[in-house]
Amino acid sequence: MRDLKTELEQRRAKGLYRSRRVLEGRQTPEQVVDGRQVIAFCSNDYLGLASHPKVIAALRKGASEYGAGAGAAHLVNGHTRAHHQLEEELAAFTNRERALLFSTGYMANLGVAQALLGRSDHVLEDRLNHASLIDAGLLSGARFQRYRHATAVDLAQRLAGLGQTGERLVLTDGVFSMDGNLAPLPELASICTAHQAWLLVDDAHGLGVLGETGAGSLEHFGLSQQQVPILMGTLGKAFGTAGAFVAGSEALIETLIQSARTYVYTTAMPAAMAEATRAALRIVQAEGKRREKLRSLVARFRAGAGQLGVRLMDSQTPIQPLVIGDAVEALRLSERLLEQDLLVPAIRPPTVPEGTARLRVTLSAAHTEAQVDRLLEALDRSMRGSEDVGSR
């Protein structure tokens, strides 16, 4: 048997031990975490909707009408009018024929890959894809390859080398969760079309944030359902609620209803959550000012960091990583910020590659300019005198 205690101590010694913090109250920038009042720069609540009064009111009303839980899978009697209306509204929002709700983005990705692929098929993934996409590819049983990060030429070469046998599924993040950069989706879409490959875009961090109406990375690039046949979006980030969906053609969605095990064999999300998400969707569509404010805060943070000599990764999204390199040093910098009542967790291997431990700053429309300036001042104080941190 494995010596689990020794393995845990080794992880701790390398600065890779993970610990949970306990949040009291709502998901807002000002939080009480482990009994300490902090300003958090680590939430994915990009538009500040998790605590929006209209979203909360819709959740309460939905619970009053439908109860606390769905009670069954969608294919038994857990699929309510609220779920059905949300699916129709998400399909219209993303300009796809149909949409299908899943309990989480992780389950959505696993379900699609399992439903479409078998042992004689091929799955190709960006090297920096989210863990759920990697697991989806591996667990599908298909022949698995990774192409160089955001490198369309490498993908094209790998697809060309597959011959004519088997289905091909290409999986990519729309916005990469640890780097904040966008995948070259127009190039990937063109290559997939040329090689008759499915393309799935996981737009967990683009939906609600990018595009004129907030419809995400595909709207940002102007890509149609024909160009990107499979869109996966999550609802627990910019929408501020929970769950996920897959959007695409009528035939795709019906295939998933019949064959996606993570859809068929699990209880539906609570209908009250579907109602809360419908309210969030209306806000996403109606209040473009939230995206405008978010873009303004991102620009302010990047300009301020540049003035301080802090080199950030090339990202124009709310994800603003500061690569430190060493995991222990990243933890130390995170602790220095926490001492100043700022919560910016260190992200370490295996979440990111070895030697690229980082602080992952995430911004929200709920932040104020004063809070962003406070973070910049704290970074300046914490990093002053350190030659190795953040390439200063």
Curated annotation (Swiss-Prot):
MF term (GO), any: pyridoxal phosphate binding
Disulfide bridge positions per record: none
Name of the top EC class for this enzyme: transferase
Keyword check for Zinc-finger: no
EC number, as in UniProt: 2.3.1.47
Keywords tagged on the record: Biotin biosynthesis, Pyridoxal phosphate, Transferase
Chain positions found as N6-(pyridoxal phosphate)lysine: K237
Cofactor(s), names only, from the UniProt record: pyridoxal 5'-phosphate
Positions of pyridoxal 5'-phosphate binding: G105, Y106, S177, H205, T234
Biological pathway: Cofactor biosynthesis; biotin biosynthesis
One annotated GO biological process: biotin biosynthetic process
Annotated residues for binding of substrate: R18, H130, T351
Oligomeric form and interacting partners: Homodimer.
Role played: Catalyzes the decarboxylative condensation of pimeloyl-[acyl-carrier protein] and L-alanine to produce 8-amino-7-oxononanoate (AON), [acyl-carrier protein], and carbon dioxide.
PANTHER family: 8-AMINO-7-OXONONANOATE SYNTHASE, CLASS II AMINOTRANSFERASE/8-AMINO-7-OXONONANOATE SYNTHASE
Protein family according to the UniProt entry: Belongs to the class-II pyridoxal-phosphate-dependent aminotransferase family. BioF subfamily.
Protein name: 8-amino-7-oxononanoate synthase
Organism: Thioalkalivibrio sulfidiphilus (strain HL-EbGR7)
Gene it is expressed from: bioF
